[in-house]
């Protein structure tokens, strides 16, 4: 072969070297996708869109769980990119307890004068209550050019995914129909492109203008459904059957209807697409991080249950919308440029009526439902007549989800030992059929067995109060006579999907234990980013 004929071949090889080196380097974008209340048994390779593609082409952990007991949104989201259990993150639930002040604290609240929510007077939000750092913080420490953004329907989801030093976190506010917003912890004003996305005169412009008048179920929804569309126990104020109102009433009513449908999740992905374009994510000198949480799926599940036509329709729409978003990322940044982790913050209990009809109820309480108001009033009167019958009636307790704290100031004023109030409260609640156990601080800190470990992972001595209530399996305590919820240590609340997808990640189905706390160390390992000492999670694969 002559030198003249060899030269083009050598030149082609030399030109290919930077591309090969870039392909072996870190991805351009890390995407953390959380689907609120997505049970593990809802996701599989049969889904035709983006979620199904992740399972088919990614590394799938079908037995993944939350490794903590109090399975709520704030706690679950905070485990994903910190690698720490809720007891360490400080975000033990959607609200936590300040027993000294005798009040509940929203998990990511902050002073309005320091971190006021734009457009919502008197409300402040920031990661101030998060005790630890996240993957985005670690990435920025190694490569300061890294940018970190998060977007979600719920403020707590976006802020928890963004971490301590996010460039911005955006969420949807129903109040006064603010639309998509942020807090002044991140920026003094919203960027113009967010204003344009919200619209100057909604619903005539902005994202609302593109929404249909009604939420009508897809034809394929009924094909994969597990029962009739109208099922006992479903919430009926926005219709128990297709179609459901979506643009009926004033703007605040629009917002409520939107959040009770899969359209809020479709819009979240639309906003994320706009964010990627406007901020140029994945186009810098360092990998960027984008956290997305799809919050509407949770509201749909609460209202109609995970086996409903509504939940099935929401899943199909999310699957399709995320498929389009993933195609967009690959078209913009190139195939092999994005690493994705998929999980959920918790699962959910099926409707008690559905369990009763299908032979799945284990709850000793009648109908599987117990009234929160009746149970709570009985307890409070019990304590009042025992400890302060001559004083003005006042609750001795403050509640945050399943956690209970005794008000310290009241106990001091009445000369009552806190331990006596704790013991009486425990006896009263454990006599109720719907309650399996009421955990004391000592039992949590020193107990043996799986449940003790799970509650220990959820427990923060400064924020979890004095008692934690464990309901009996499949029991539901609620103020409502319809819908369902989550928050227990049982697998229907703890089993979540977990999938990793991207360059260098071979398709595989990996049985066995994995947890949401494993996501951050696994992604950090793939990025070559050092992690803090003392993480609760582990690297799942090389």
Task: Please place each PLM-identified region on the residue numbering.
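Bacterial N-terminal signal peptides
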Residues: 8-18
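Non-catalytic, well-ordered alpha-helical segments in soluble enzyme domains
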Residues: 40, 53, 132-141, 401-439, ...
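Short, structured active-site-proximal loop/turn typified by the sulfatase FGly-forming signature C/S-X-P-X-R
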Residues: 41-90, 95, 145-151
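Secreted, luminal/periplasmic, and some membrane-associated catalytic domains
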Residues: 72, 94-124, 162-164, 168, ...
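Active-site regions of oxyanion-processing enzymes, predominantly non-cytosolic
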Residues: 146-152, 158-159, 220-226, 265-299, ...
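Active-site His/acidic residue clusters
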Residues: 159-168, 243-256, 260, 283-318, ...
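Long, low-complexity, polar/charged, intrinsically disordered or flexibly structured peripheral segments
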Residues: 204-274
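A long, amphipathic alpha-helix that forms part
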Residues: 258-284, 297-338, 422-424, 428, ...
């Amino acid at each position: 072969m002559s030198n003249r004929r060899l030269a083009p071949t050598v030149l082609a090889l030399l030109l290919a070297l930077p591309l090969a080196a870039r392909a072996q380097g870190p991805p351009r974008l890390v995407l953390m996708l959380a689907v609120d209340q997505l049970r593990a048994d809802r996701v599989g390779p049969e889904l035709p869109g983006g979620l199904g593609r992740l399972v088919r082409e990614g590394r799938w952990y079908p037995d993944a769980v939350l490794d903590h007991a109090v399975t709520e949104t704030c706690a679950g989201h905070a485990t994903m990119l910190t690698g720490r259990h809720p007891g360490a993150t400080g975000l033990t639930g959607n609200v936590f307890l300040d027993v000294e002040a005798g009040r509940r604290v929203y998990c990511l609240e902050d002073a309005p004068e320091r971190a006021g929510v734009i457009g919502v007077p008197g409300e402040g939000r920031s990661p101030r209550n998060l005790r630890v750092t996240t993957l985005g913080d670690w990435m920025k420490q190694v490569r300061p050019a890294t940018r970190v953004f998060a977007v979600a329907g719920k403020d707590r989801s976006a802020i928890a995914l963004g971490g301590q030093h996010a460039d911005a976190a955006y969420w949807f506010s129903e109040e006064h129909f603010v639309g998509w917003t942020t807090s002044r912890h991140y920026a003094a004003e919203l960027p113009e492109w967010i204003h344009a996305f919200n619209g100057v005169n909604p619903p005539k412009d902005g994202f609302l203008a593109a929404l249909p008048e009604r939420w009508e179920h897809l034809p394929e929804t009924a094909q994969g459904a597990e029962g009739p569309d109208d099922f006992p126990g479903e919430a009926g104020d926005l219709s128990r059957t297709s179609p459901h109102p979506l643009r009926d009433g004033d703007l605040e009513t629009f917002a409520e209807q939107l959040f009770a449908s899969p359209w809020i999740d479709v819009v979240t992905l639309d906003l994320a697409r706009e964010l990627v374009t406007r901020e140029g994510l994945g186009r810098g000198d360092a990998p960027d991080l984008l956290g997305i949480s799809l919050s509407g799926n949770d509201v749909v599940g609460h209202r109609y249950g995970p086996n409903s036509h509504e939940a099935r329709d929401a899943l199909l729409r999310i699957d399709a919308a995320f498929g389009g978003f993933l195609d967009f990322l690959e078209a913009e940044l190139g195939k092999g440029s994005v690493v994705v982790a998929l999980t959920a913050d918790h699962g959910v209990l099926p409707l008690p009526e559905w369990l009763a009809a299908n032979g799945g109820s284990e709850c000793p309480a009648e109908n599987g439902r117990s009234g929160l108001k009746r149970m709570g009033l009985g307890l409070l009167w019990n304590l009042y007549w025992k400890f302060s019958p001559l004083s003005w009636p006042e609750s001795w307790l403050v509640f945050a989800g399943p956690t209970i704290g005794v008000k310290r100031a009241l106990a001091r004023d009445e000369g009552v030992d806190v331990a006596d109030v704790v013991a009486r409260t425990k006896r009263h609640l454990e006599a109720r059929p719907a309650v399996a156990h009421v955990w004391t601080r000592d039992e949590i800190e020193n107990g043996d067995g799986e449940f003790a470990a799970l509650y220990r992972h959820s427990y923060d001595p400064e924020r979890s109060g004095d008692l934690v209530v464990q309901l009996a399996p499949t029991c539901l305590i609620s103020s409502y006579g319809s819908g369902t919820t989550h928050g227990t240590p049982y697998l229907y609340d703890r089993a979540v999907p977990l999938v990793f997808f991207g360059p260098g990640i071979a398709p595989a189905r990996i049985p066995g234990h994995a947890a949401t706390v494993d996501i951050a160390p696994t992604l950090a390992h793939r990025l070559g980013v050092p992690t803090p000492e003392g993480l609760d999670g582990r690297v799942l694969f090389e």
